[in-house]
Amino acid sequence: MPTLNLERLQALRARTFRVLPKARLTSPAQAVDFVNERGFVFFWPVKGLLLPSLWTAVAGDRPVADEHDDPGHVTWGWKDNSLDKRVWYYGKILHRKATFISLEIAPYFYALSENYGDIAEDHLVAYEEGRLTLAAKLVYEALLSKGKMNTIDLRKEAHLTSKSSDSEFNRALEHLQADFKVLPVGTAEAGAWKYAYQFDITARHFPELPEKARRIGEAEARRKLAELYLGSVGAVQLRDVTRLFGWPPELSKRTLAHLVESGKLCAGLSHPQTAGEWFALTELVD
């Protein structure tokens, strides 16, 4: 059985994750270039999910600091200041964690979402079929009718202001973000902390996104995203793809098989330190 070359794998990840000091990001413009280069990255590292993150590319391969004055937290300002600039797509997407997506790649994600063209109707179908909670429906309809709102006002409009509604409201926002129905588009001085995200309907903030996505088939979208993922991490097991993207195992397997058939990946590989079948870029195989 062919074996992964760990030295080459580690070298690739050091490059794509920007862990070396000389490769670190030092400006918002470099951060945008980094996201465009990788296609999609996490804001902060996510335990159990291997993917480049803005934090690591700025602060190095270390845990996110608790101290607010840590130099690595410059990333927070970069994120907030970019939300209304349309330089990338940002929201709680992959595994419902904070994710940056390049504008070129966003249509591939959108093509896999449950959005089919009518922003005033899709959510109703999803609700009637049990794929959208009542809280998510209320939040979405508040934004649909009133326009961009900060989270404090949004809770009031959605009638989810009670303390017992905290988790319900937060889950609704996460679900709507993960399905590309809403996204944060700015911040506002609101609430006790004088800080709150502003949200809007995705298709209203990026009106060209649905049309671009309409030309992309689901299988094509999955292949593109899986190829970018492998380009960032070099080698994966089937479960890694399934967990990151939330795809059914059979679709993940079919997607990887197509990349193998096209010569972009090798399959049936062994890892010197981890059992199971691995898929990897061809240049990482001995």
Residues of each region from the PLM?
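Long, low-complexity intrinsically disordered regions
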Residues: 1-286
